[in-house]
Each structure stands twice: as structure tokens, then as C-alpha cells.
């Protein structure tokens, strides 16, 4: 049997993934910061999922963006349904820690969200983000429309040029469409840094400006 450490740098194969459960984890459906629902139909609003390391700090980055209606943290991109935090940390689910961002396209452009995403972490680090090591910390953009997907790819290429000029390696961000199922994380993790203002935040960018979303 493989140890947990074996899954820090590679995704589990189908037979290695934990089975998970049919029932979703309990969720208090109110955003602690803005009072909006975390789960719903969100008619007339757009959605995207971002993975950029530990989701505690990542979520705060996006709930502070004007035009974002709500945010929630969860697990996405893997195989285990309704995984728990401890299961995700084992590396045996294949999920990355993700932030669901629900936004009003009339108030904030997708390009602006992409700029926040790229500048808030180092997308060249593969299966880690800073001191946080494991497949659950990989960089990811999970798109809900073809237009989002095309924009995400174009933004990656534009930002790669800036990173290369500054001495960074290749972007390893996983960009997918359609977006995989987003499994909401436990209540304790929702808006974590609003509940614990001095809590851990390992998020750190490269300092390289992303040349998109400036005039959007």
C-alpha cells in the first residue's frame, strides 16, 4: 500500500482514489462577509472556480473584489465525491483546494478576475504553493463557458511572457472546460480569514504584473 507521501507530487490513479460519499457535507448557506448565499442557482450571474494554493487566503482575495456576488471554498478537479478536508490533504482524492467565485459581469469583468488570480500566487510551482506542498495546492482555472476558457488560455500566454522576462519558469496552471463538480468544503473553512483574521495565509504572488484587465 502506498503511503500518503506518495501522492504529494502526483495525482492518484482511479483505483487509488478514496471512495468519498454520496451525501454533501453540511453547509451554512450564508456568506459571513456579505450575507449572500454560498449555494444556489445564481440566475443572471457568472461562475468560475480558481485554485491558487491554500483556499483560506485565496477566498479573501476574491470576496474583496467589487462585483463579486459571493465566494465559497471547496474541492474540485479530482475523483472523490464529497471529500473531507483530511481526505483532500492525504492526496488521495485528486482535488485541488478551490474557490467558487460568483460574479456580476456588468460590475466586474472576467479579465479583472483573471488578473487577480495570476497576481495573487506563483503559477509556476506545480504541485505546491510556497511552503504548502501537495496536489491539493496546484494552480487551476475551471471555466464554466467556452468564452472563459478562451480568455483564460490567452491570459496564461500573456502572463507567461511577463514571467519569462522576469526569470520565472513555465506556468503549470491547469485550465479546464467544462468545470468539474465543485464540492463545498466544511463550514469551518468557509470565509476562514473573516472568522480568524490572524489565521494562516500562505498566499504570495511573484510581484510580476499581469497585463490584462487593466482597462476592463
UniProtKB/Swiss-Prot annotation:
Looking up InterPro entries in the UniProt record yields:
Met_Sox_Rdtase_MsrA_dom, Met_Sox_Rdtase_MsrA_sf, MsrA_MetSO_reductase
Q: Which reaction does it catalyse?
A: L-methionyl-[protein] + [thioredoxin]-disulfide + H2O = L-methionyl-(S)-S-oxide-[protein] + [thioredoxin]-dithiol; [thioredoxin]-disulfide + L-methionine + H2O = L-methionine (S)-S-oxide + [thioredoxin]-dithiol
Top enzyme class:
oxidoreductase
**Entry-linked Pfam families:** PMSR
Instruction: State the UniProt keywords alphabetically.
Output: Oxidoreductase
Q: Name one GO biological process term.
A: cellular response to oxidative stress
Active site feature: 54
**EC number, UniProt record:** 1.8.4.11
**Disulfide bond positions:** none
Q: Which GO terms describe its molecular function?
A: L-methionine-(S)-S-oxide reductase activity; peptide-methionine (S)-S-oxide reductase activity
Source superkingdom: Bacteria
Q: Any one cellular component term from GO for this entry?
A: cytoplasm
| Record's function text | Has an important function as a repair enzyme for proteins that have been inactivated by oxidation. Catalyzes the reversible oxidation-reduction of methionine sulfoxide in proteins to methionine.
Cite the NCBIfam families for this sequence: msrA
The entry sums up its family as follows: Belongs to the MsrA Met sulfoxide reductase family.
What protein name applies here?
Peptide methionine sulfoxide reductase MsrA
Q: Which classification does the entry list for the species?
A: Bacteria, Pseudomonadati, Pseudomonadota, Gammaproteobacteria, Lysobacterales
Amino acid at each position: 500500500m502506498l503511503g500518503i507521501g506518495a501522492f504529494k507530487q502526483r495525482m492518484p490513479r482511479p483505483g487509488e482514489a478514496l471512495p468519498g460519499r454520496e451525501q454533501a457535507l453540511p453547509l451554512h448557506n450564508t456568506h459571513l462577509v456579505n450575507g449572500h448565499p454560498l449555494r444556489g442557482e445564481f440566475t443572471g450571474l457568472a461562475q468560475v472556480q480558481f485554485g491558487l494554493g491554500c483556499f483560506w487566503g485565496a477566498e479573501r482575495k476574491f470576496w474583496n473584489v467589487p462585483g463579486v456576488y459571493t465566494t465559497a471554498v471547496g474541492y474540485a478537479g479530482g475523483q472523490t465525491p464529497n471529500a473531507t478536508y483530511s481526505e483532500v490533504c492525504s492526496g488521495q482524492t485528486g482535488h485541488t483546494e478551490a474557490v467558487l467565485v460568483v460574479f456580476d459581469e456588468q460590475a466586474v469583468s472576467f479579465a479583472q478576475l483573471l488578473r487577480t488570480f495570476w497576481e495573487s500566487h506563483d503559477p509556476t510551482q506545480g504541485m505546491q504553493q510556497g511552503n504548502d506542498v501537495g496536489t491539493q495546492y496546484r494552480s487551476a482555472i475551471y471555466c464554466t463557458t467556452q468564452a472563459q476558457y478562451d480568455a483564460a488560455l490567452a491570459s496564461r500566454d500573456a502572463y507567461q511572457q511577463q514571467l519569462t522576462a522576469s526569470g520565472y519558469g513555465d506556468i503549470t496552471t491547469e485550465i479546464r472546460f467544462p468545470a468539474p463538480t465543485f464540492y463545498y468544503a466544511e463550514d469551518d473553512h468557509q470565509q476562514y480569514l473573516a472568522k480568524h483574521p490572524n489565521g494562516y495565509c500562505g498566499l504570495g504572488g511573484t510581484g510580476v504584473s499581469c497585463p490584462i484587465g487593466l482597462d476592463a
